[in-house]
C-alpha cells in the first residue's frame, strides 16, 4: 500500500499564493481529510498532489519517491483522482463509464474479459450501484452520478485514491455508506470536505 507525504507544498495561481507551506502524511489503509471552508485551496492542493496541476514549491512523495519522478501513466496506476465537479459521460452505460477507470491497467485485449467485468461490477457494488450497470448515465440522479465517478476511481485499482468533496450530492445514508466503504477498502484515501 502507498504512503503519501506532502512536504511544504506551495501552489500559486498567477502571483497569488493559494496554498502555502502545507505538510501532512496519509497512511495506508487510513482516510485523511483536508478540511476547510470554500475557497481556501483544498481542491487546488488535491489537484496538485494528483499531478493535475503543478505545485510551485515543496514536494509530494509516494513511498518516498517524488511524484515528479513518475510518468503520467505511472501516476495513474499509483493514484486515482476524482474531482469535485466530475460527472459521467451521459451517452455511456454506467458499466462502460466505470470501465474507463481501468484504462491505466489493462491491455486492449483484456477489455471485456470476465476478470475486468468483475472489477467493474465490484466497484459499482461498493457504492451501491451494481444493479444499474446497464443504465445510461444520463438517466442517473445527481447522487448516483457522484457515486458513479467514485466507482470509476475505485475501479482504477490504485493504492491511493483522492476525492474532492466526495459526499457532494449524496443523502446522509449514502454519505455514511461511502465513508464506511472507503475506510474498509484498505487504500490510502485523501478527501476534501468543508
Residue ranges and their predicted role:
Residues 58-66:
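Conserved ABC transporter NBD signature motif
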Residues 99, 114-132:
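Conserved ABC ATPase "signature" region
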Residues 35-37:
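The feature captures the beta-strand-to-loop junction immediately N-terminal to the Walker
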Residues 110-111, 136-140, 144:
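Conserved ABC ATPase signature
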Residues 50:
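Helix-to-loop junction immediately C-terminal to a conserved catalytic motif
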Residues 161-165, 170:
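Catalytic Walker B motif of ABC-type/P-loop ATPase nucleotide-binding domains
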Residues 4-6, 18-21:
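Conserved structural motif at the start of ABC-family nucleotide-binding domains
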Amino acid at each position: 500500500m502507498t504512503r503519501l507525504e506532502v512536504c511544504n507544498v506551495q501552489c500559486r495561481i498567477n502571483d497569488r499564493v493559494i496554498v502555502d507551506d502545507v505538510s501532512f502524511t496519509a497512511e495506508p489503509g487510513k482516510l485523511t481529510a483536508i478540511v476547510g471552508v470554500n475557497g481556501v485551496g483544498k481542491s487546488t492542493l488535491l489537484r496538485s498532489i494528483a499531478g493535475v496541476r503543478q505545485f510551485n514549491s515543496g514536494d509530494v512523495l509516494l513511498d518516498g519517491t517524488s511524484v515528479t519522478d513518475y510518468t503520467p501513466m505511472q501516476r495513474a496506476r499509483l493514484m486515482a483522482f476524482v474531482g469535485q465537479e466530475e460527472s459521467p459521460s451521459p451517452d455511456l452505460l454506467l458499466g462502460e463509464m466505470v470501465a474507463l477507470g481501468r484504462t491505466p491497467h489493462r491491455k486492449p485485449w483484456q477489455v471485456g474479459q470476465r476478470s475486468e467485468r468483475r472489477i467493474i461490477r465490484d466497484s459499482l457494488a461498493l457504492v451501491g450501484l451494481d444493479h444499474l450497470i446497464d443504465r445510461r448515465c444520463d438517466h442517473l440522479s445527481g447522487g448516483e452520478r457522484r457515486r458513479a465517478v467514485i466507482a470509476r476511481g475505485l475501479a482504477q485499482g490504485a493504492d491511493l485514491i483522492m476525492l474532492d468533496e466526495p459526499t457532494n450530492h449524496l443523502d446522509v445514508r449514502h454519505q455514511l455508506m461511502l465513508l464506511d466503504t472507503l475506510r474498509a477498502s484498505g487504500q490510502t484515501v485523501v478527501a476534501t470536505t468543508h
